[in-house]
Amino acid sequence: MLDIKLIRKAPEECEIRLRKKDPNISLLPILDLDKEVRRLKTDSESLQSQRKLLSTQIHKAKAQGEDASNMISEVERISQDLEKLEASLEEKNATLQDLLVRLPNYPEEDVPVCPDKSGNQVIKSVGALPTFSFTPKHHVELNQKLQILDFKLPAKTSGSGWPAYKNQGVMLEWALLTYLLNKQREHGFQLWLPPLLVKREILFGSGQIPKFDGQYYCVEDGDQSLYLIPTAEVVLNGFHSQEIFNEKDLPIYYAACTPCFRREAGAAGANERGLVRVHQFNKVEMFAFTTPEQADQAYEKMLAVVEDILTELKLPYRLSLLSTGDMSFTASKTIDAEVWLPGQQSYYEVSSISQCTDFQSRRSETRYKDSQGKMHFIHTLNGSGLATPRLFVAILENNQQKDGSVVIPEVLRPYLGNQEVLLPQE
């Protein structure tokens, strides 16, 4: 959520910045409503002051045995006017807040301006793309012999986009998740296994709604609806909603391992079948609470974790600075880490590291007190560390052998009883 005071102070500048994300944004309706709301508040305060003064005079008149009927009638009239005014104020303020919460975060100055992902800028590439003496297979084709995934049986129970891991695939997935959590711990992150269901206001606080309302799985729990998390970012941000930190306790780094649930798996082409786009997947998520001055260092820390992991897994990857049209609603800046998938002959995102400034904390009312006792909204950052489906695919496709076997990355072998190769089962 944006600061209305800044919008009032520099409306043209704010609108220019916001239009980098959405060229259709106009702040005029917000500014007009804001003026009306402030006028109504002033009128309300004036009427309340008049009523209070008259009430004092009525009390004195009665104490002195004087007639106060005219003043009593005036108080009744003011009360009726005040009731109507406050109803109008409540309605207009609700409309104003609804418009405000639909505005995205401002992009940083160094973010490329483009309406779509074609404007993303590759800022770093690491590792040579693998060469094969044979035609490399898509992971779905590799699976025909490896038998580590199943797409048909879960389609019977849950529909398309809900794959199941089996046999050696289960062990590889858990090895990967355990390895990822250990890396987070090495880098100083507090580990969490948080709830998978959250209240609606927690989704609001992280910026998922109202803009993306209807895109999340909902569970009815009596009179309350709970939502399956699309990412652990939601619940980690929500842990400290309406709380006040002391500056000396910041920064705070969290990492959570959870399944993630998304209704839109995306339109999958022929190459994007299998694990590339799914409704449920496992992910280790990083999250940080910082002061504005600590945010850049936290951003570099998260990026370093991701690069450390991809380097140890010996996967070719690149970092892309996302354009304004490809960034998330909440982010002011995002760098994607993308791994090379030979089966798709393309790079695919496995991590997004985002700065969110005070956008989420204003919605969640998360603040900190500085050494002088002054209150500030906290800054938040998040990043995947990492999402496993495409990482799983990258391991299979980049390390495949001619006979259909897959060489297990060395760093994962200790979690698999020092097993070196996934062997075909046929």
Curated annotation (Swiss-Prot):
One of its GO terms (molecular function) is serine-tRNA ligase activity. One of its GO terms (cellular component) is cytoplasm. Coiled coil: none annotated. It is found in: Cytoplasm. InterPro entries: aa-tRNA-synt_IIb (IPR002314), aa-tRNA-synth_II (IPR006195), aa-tRNA-synth_II/BPL/LPL (IPR045864), Ser-tRNA-ligase_type_1 (IPR002317), Ser-tRNA-synth_1_N (IPR015866), SerRS_1_N_sf (IPR042103), SerRS_core (IPR033729), tRNA-bd_arm (IPR010978). It catalyses: tRNA(Ser) + L-serine + ATP = L-seryl-tRNA(Ser) + AMP + diphosphate + H(+); tRNA(Sec) + L-serine + ATP = L-seryl-tRNA(Sec) + AMP + diphosphate + H(+). One of its GO terms (biological process) is selenocysteine biosynthetic process. The keyword Aminoacyl-tRNA synthetase applies. Its main location: cytoplasm. Pathway: Aminoacyl-tRNA biosynthesis; selenocysteinyl-tRNA(Sec) biosynthesis; L-seryl-tRNA(Sec) from L-serine and tRNA(Sec): step 1/1. Its EC number is 6.1.1.11. Keywords: Aminoacyl-tRNA synthetase, ATP-binding, Cytoplasm, Ligase, Nucleotide-binding, Protein biosynthesis. ATP binds at residues 262-264, 278, 349-352. The keyword Plastid does not apply. L-serine binds at residues 231-233, 285, 384. Belongs to the class-II aminoacyl-tRNA synthetase family. Type-1 seryl-tRNA synthetase subfamily. Homodimer. The tRNA molecule binds across the dimer. Catalyzes the attachment of serine to tRNA(Ser). Is also able to aminoacylate tRNA(Sec) with serine, to form the misacylated tRNA L-seryl-tRNA(Sec), which will be further converted into selenocysteinyl-tRNA(Sec). Consists of two distinct domains, a catalytic core and a N-terminal extension that is involved in tRNA binding. This is Serine--tRNA ligase. It comes from Chlamydia caviae (strain ATCC VR-813 / DSM 19441 / 03DC25 / GPIC).
